[in-house]
């Protein structure tokens, strides 16, 4: 489907009047995604609330040790929260975290609990920040679109003074009705650990700002860990914490543990267990976001220097590197099977990078401003032969999927999510992106883009042809048959040697295995060889010399031979030199994707994108949360009215204005003042 191929026929290139209209539904091959009629009032009040003047606030103390105090009184509950950007310092981006606690609330459509004790009941819990405030709500149940997030009835509310919450994350591994662990990062550098059930459980890390004085840009619990988490800062540092250990009373001392191209890893010098346990210095400038692979073994980081770096977390080795086309990278996510990484950033593009091949496989152009959020949709990402091969769960055969293409691909329509791929076949990855241009885009990454058959089949003679099997299938997998979960030892046997360099990898930088030399040069040879296979002789001659840039001390002539053979603490990637190599291919050297859907869905920049089984959740900077029902999951007007009444949950997907929160002081107890 062409860009913007939804109802109304408008797209990115339509008239200004059409582009200004906020969409309430969009269509894909599986049907219509709808924002139901119950959201009309909230939608009409959205722009008005964004223009409501914010009452003058009392002066706040500057962030620092003096403002990091214990529990205290909250600010006035009657003043509306800030809506949208305004004069003065920019507000932190609105973030949303969701945790699932097993079975949904037994109350069904009954009134949700209005006290903090209600956090212990089943269902989902949602946390999001707005300005200096942090809100907690009962979220969507497992039938995601059949319950809305009622922003007028918060379970808990916390107001912070002197600093602002910038990010947060629930511990899904330990989440239960008796404990909900949450991490909150702040603009002054502190990190708070709290339990929403056990009110006496609360800790503040980096309280005196001795570890790092810059804002916390992102934090995440380690997969399947009860106590370990990572926190990244605007300084470009990534810290490993243990909630069971205290912080040192003096600035921590570190010893160099490992070093490579563009990164360094330090261990804390301390006889007693103290936080932080380790520090990573990654890239140049702020470390904007990071994400663990589905198997929890690899860590993908994106920085303001425009680099995507993928590390093997346990061995702290650099496994992959990619450079943005322009500017910094702001967001990152993994595909459900761990084969691909998608990034978005200041080049207005979404970039798909293959972890198994170490190269950019596609770029997507549909946004007109920075891309703030990217996410794969595991419920429409599918392998069409998986159902036939597995023969489980009563899924339809491949012939039935071909007969009913519009019904395939949704979580409720018999699609086969990739987690991981049981068998190689016709693969379609679905992912989405949300940008500062208020546009929401959906993208399909299909097999013809991932494995282009005709050009490669004519000249490629080495094993591991991408046109026949996925790249991981031809890699040495230590005896593991077929493409399954990414193993700890991922071989690069499908990498092609450079015709001039003989495939030698000199220079430190990227390592495939401990003790095995691996350099960025192999990334460059991949793209150069594929350009030759496509018959692009002109491009090959034009950029042939650039293939030696990243080969370090491999003996090649040109600027590559001038790089030092030893590791460097920070990245020295020159954008002018890497452009045209595998680290950063030119626009015409990789497929350019068109969005399946590209719609304006908000008045302010979008900051949140979550894919759930029955719905999609988006949020924008003015504090509006939208729930989009998947095809076949939306109620009619009569059903919505029948299930929405006085004192009951509105059971249709809705978008609510945070301005209504302040009218519920009884439901908004204050928390820790930082």
From Swiss-Prot:
The modification Phosphoserine is found at residue 495. Keywords: Acetylation, Cell projection, Cytoplasm, Methylation, Nucleus, Phosphoprotein, Repeat, WD repeat. Residues 642-674 have a biased composition (Polar residues). Residues 31-92, 103-122, 384-419, 456-516, 532-573, 637-674 are annotated as: Disordered. The modification N-acetylalanine is found at residue 2. Regulator of the deubiquitinating USP12/DMWD/WDR48 complex. Functions as a cofactor that promotes USP12 enzymatic activity. The modification Omega-N-methylarginine is found at residue 551. It holds the Pfam family WD40. One of its GO terms (molecular function) is deubiquitinase activator activity. It comes from Homo sapiens. The gene is DMWD. Residues 500-509, 550-563 have a biased composition (Gly residues). It is found in: Cytoplasm; Nucleus; Perikaryon; Cell projection, Dendrite. This is Dystrophia myotonica WD repeat-containing protein. Component of the USP12/DMWD/WDR48 deubiquitinating complex. Interacts with USP12; promotes its enzymatic activity. Interacts with USP46. It comes from the Eukaryota. WD repeats lie at residues 211-251, 282-321, 324-363, 366-409, 413-453, 601-638. InterPro entries: WD40/YVTN_repeat-like_dom_sf (IPR015943), WD40_repeat_dom_sf (IPR036322), WD40_rpt (IPR001680), WD_repeat_creC_regulators (IPR051362). Its main location: cytoplasm. GO terms for cellular component: cytoplasm; dendrite; nucleus; perikaryon. Residues 53-65, 78-90 have a biased composition (Pro residues). Residues 66-77, 107-118, 457-478, 487-499 have a biased composition (Low complexity).
